[in-house]
Every structure is written in structure tokens, then in C-alpha cells.
């Protein structure tokens, strides 16, 4: 949930697309209602404190923190992190290169946290993934093309008997022209990814 003016200049070459892609309060409420009807949990990244207050009114169960927020790139990064921390709810955090995990842990000292390995390239070249580092995290923010990296991460973590594994993947509708469309998978690929993960979950590695 973000406001285009907070994150981008109006001179950005994709400004019109970015502006149309804002997740407003009204849109968030609609998605929450649809998610509830499907029995799915709704949560999201939010980039300004008022957004946290609104999501609290929707009774979300957890929050996501984007890597750019951890890097304090945006006008309200610190205030937004503090607002999320004050809810006491679980937090999922994408740790981009340069993020201080100790600093973020201090902010969320009273929250249950899940840290995700993340390289903020769009798309991310598969060969840039440092698997030794990635497997130190319980989550993976996957910006590669396709679903191979997510499947590998899940398999490796399952082999290590990890009790909690989180995968983040950008998903788009067919012919979507959103700002992250070029690095997102379509619904059929999401279904394929979930199917692979469910098989891995049932696997025995000991």
C-alpha cells in the first residue's frame, strides 16, 4: 500500500502506470473482502503510517516490510516501521543488500519476525543468488524469472528440516502492464509453484 508521490518523481518515465497502480484504502478493503470470502489471509507491504492505521481497522493479522523500507529510502520509512512494530503483530521482512538486520531486529524486538533473503534487482539474474547466504533466512523474496529459484529454496530449506518457510513471488494477471509486470509470473505459474511446494512439503529427507 503506497502513494506514488512518496516513492517516485512525477517525471519518472512510467509515472502514469505507477500512479494507476497505487493500492488505495478502497482497493485494499475490496481485496480484503474478497480474500476473506475465499478463506485466504490478506496482508501487504505498507509504506506510510496512515496505511498501517487503516489496515489495523481491517484487522489484518501480519505485515510485510519491503527491502526499500529497511534501507530507509522513502520519506516515512522509519515512522512506518515503528507503526508496524507497535501493533505487536508478526512481521515479514525482505532484507535487501545493505539492510542492517540488527537495526531492524531492534525496531521489531517485540514482534515475531520472518526475515527474507532479497536482492532488489528486477528481474534478478539467477546466478547472482548466494545460496549459502540465502539459506540463513527463513524466507525468500524471489525476483527471478520463472519459479525454479523458489522451488530450489524450498527444497534446500526442507532438507535442513526448517519448520517455517516463506516464499514471496510477484504475480500478475494476463497482459498486465503494472510497473513490476516484466518480472512477475502469471496465475498458471503460481499454481505450478504451489503444486511443487506441496510435493516438497510431503518429502522425507532423513
Predicted regions and their residues:
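Catalytic cores and adjacent flexible loops of soluble metabolic enzymes
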Residues: 1-206
Amino acid at each position: 500500500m503506497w502513494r506514488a508521490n512518496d516513492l517516485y518523481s512525477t517525471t519518472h518515465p512510467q509515472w502514469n502506470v505507477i500512479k494507476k497502480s497505487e493500492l488505495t484504502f478502497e482497493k485494499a478493503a475490496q481485496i480484503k473482502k474478497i480474500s476473506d470470502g475465499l478463506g485466504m489471509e490478506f496482508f501487504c507491504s505498507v509504506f506510510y503510517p496512515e496505511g498501517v492505521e487503516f489496515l489495523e481497522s481491517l484487522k489484518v493479522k501480519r505485515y510485510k516490510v519491503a527491502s526499500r523500507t529497511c534501507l530507509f529510502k522513502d520519506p516515512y520509512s522509519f515512522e512506518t516501521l515503528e507503526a508496524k512494530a507497535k501493533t505487536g503483530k508478526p512481521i515479514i521482512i525482505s532484507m535487501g543488500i545493505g539492510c542492517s538486520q540488527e537495526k531492524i531486529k531492534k525496531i521489531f524486538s517485540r514482534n515475531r519476525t520472518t526475515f527474507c533473503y532479497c536482492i532488489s534487482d528486477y528481474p534478478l539474474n539467477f546466478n547472482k543468488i548466494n545460496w549459502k547466504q540465502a539459506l540463513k533466512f527463513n524466507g525468500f523474496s524471489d525476483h527471478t524469472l520463472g519459479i525454479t529459484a523458489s522451488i530450489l529454496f524450498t527444497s534446500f530449506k526442507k532438507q535442513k528440516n526448517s519448520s517455517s518457510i516463506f516464499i514471496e513471488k510477484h504475480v500478475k494477471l494476463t497482459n498486465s502492464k503494472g510497473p513490476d509486470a516484466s518480472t512477475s509470473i502469471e496465475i498458471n505459474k503460481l499454481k505450478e509453484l504451489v503444486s511443487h511446494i506441496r510435493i516438497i512439503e510431503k518429502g522425507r529427507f532423513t
